[in-house]
Amino acid sequence: AGAALEDGAEEKPGEEDNFDNITPVVPASNKLNIPASVWDKSTKERGEEISNYDNTVVKRNLDSSEFKDISIFSESEKYIARTHSMDTDMIEYQDGSKFLRAIKKDMKRLEGFSKQGNITPDKYNKKYYYLVLKNKELSVDQQKAIVAATEYASRNGIVLKLYTTE
């Protein structure tokens, strides 16, 4: 551990996720009013559609051409958020440790965010990471990855919230 991983996500020594010792838990998730058909689209199109879907907590309110690391800012509730959708059917994500690495690699963009434009640290005190998945049962390995990702987020001042499409 501590060596650079093949996908570019680097872990600090002592930050390994002792994957075998994680107890799998079926994570509680919230269903979004987004049709399952979004999963038939390309990754980029799916992400854009999910983050532009009206009346959902994951709806982007920041300009995507300017804000790459966060997609949501609430000045009244003092939080920033990043939404990430992942297709759990992808062969690569059947491997729980690869699934976890991909989540953490993306989450580091939110973790590293402090200020941009008029969004400065004095205007928010919470960071949310909205992970959007298909509405289907996760494998034991994927459940372990979500548990580890939630713990990782918590250690780094982030609240991971899990959502599913219809």
PLM-predicted stretches and their roles:
Residues 1-23:
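Hydrophobic, gly/ala-rich membrane-insertion helices/peptides used by toxins and envelope proteins
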Residues 7, 11, 15, 53-56, ...:
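Surface-exposed polar/charged interaction patches
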Residues 14, 20-23, 129, 138, ...:
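Residue-level detector of intrinsically disordered/flexible regions characterized by low predicted structural confidence
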Residues 17-68, 73-76:
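Acidic-basic catalytic patches of nuclease active cores, encompassing PD-(D/E)XK
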Residues 60-67, 84-158:
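Catalytic cores of nucleic-acid endonucleases
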Residues 78-82:
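Secretion-targeting segments and adjacent low-complexity export tracts
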Residues 156-166:
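A generic structural motif
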